[in-house]
Amino acid sequence: MKKGVMSAISMLMGATAGAGVVGKVQGDKLKITKDMSAKHLKLFLMMNQWVKVKQEGKNLSTYFENKGYKRIAIYGMSYAGETLVDELKDTGIEVVYGIDQNADSIFADIDIVTMDDTLEEVDAVVVTAITFFGEIEEKLSGKLNCSIISLEDILYEV
């Protein structure tokens, strides 16, 4: 009888612990999914603003010229970074290099380095990874003596 009761109690404890673990894992997955969703929404809204800027006949090179930025670097060389490089081609703005944590796997028309590399001084760094702008700005400020600007801010200011 004692064995049966102990077995039943052990089974209930195991089921409870298992349910708790499954709930925790599912909760973690849900948080990751929500974070990714928010990140992609911000990216979509930024790119939508860029389309509006282009529809108004504006070019981002004007922003940099008005600020006196001739040589820039771009942090975040995914879609937005590549698009910015393309937009600034054949303008008076030189994109000196890109910065990306996945520098080894990115192929671009400019040099791509990581934050750990020695960063050449430029007039400004444009951060395309807008979700993490605060963290990136803090790290870059310790390595460079230049303006660090969010691409999102540029798009709403131009």
PLM-predicted stretches and their roles:
Residues 2-158:
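Hydrophobic, well-ordered beta-alpha structural blocks that scaffold small-molecule cofactor pockets
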